[in-house]
Amino acid sequence: MQSLEKKILEDGIIIGNDILKVDSFINHQIDCNLLWNISRHIANKFQNVDKIVTIETSGIAFAVGTAMQFDNIPVVFAKKSTSKIVDDSSCYKASVKSFTKGSINEIRIDKRFLIEGERVLIVDDFLAEGNAALGLVDILKQAKTEIVGVAVCVEKRFQGGRKKLEDLGYKVYSAASIDAFKDGKPVFHRA
């Protein structure tokens, strides 16, 4: 998606060899026009979606934007922590390693919010090694839903997440796909 690639070139910051900081327009402050355009592009790539699933927190805005494109279908987000109001035994759970934080989280979704046979689209802000998406896939399989695909705003293709998901048979769409970082700039994937 040209407008996202342009924004990444203008405002994205590369840290080291594998981190792209986009907090000024995706995952701390959100550019709402960009969000709307990304959401529209995602919705155009998938059909017959009953529900959208993401993981807290940065994927939520893009999941909601995409859900609005599908006539306001529900969005469910996996939580990274427990609380007094959630009975952990009534949740589907999976362990997920955070690439940027280097920690492992047990994510969970209340069983009431995933219905067997539902067609579910996973939406997130980033795809790197694929850990978050694979954790959501695990939960959605436990719930016996049908996974329509995985859609992300930004993909760092060189980290292998897409391949893992495609090897499992899932369709993957990214609004901006990066093959590498070279001379402090992202090199965007061209089909």
Each predicted region: which residue ranges?
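PRPP-associated nucleotide enzymes
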Residues: M1-V123, L127-A191
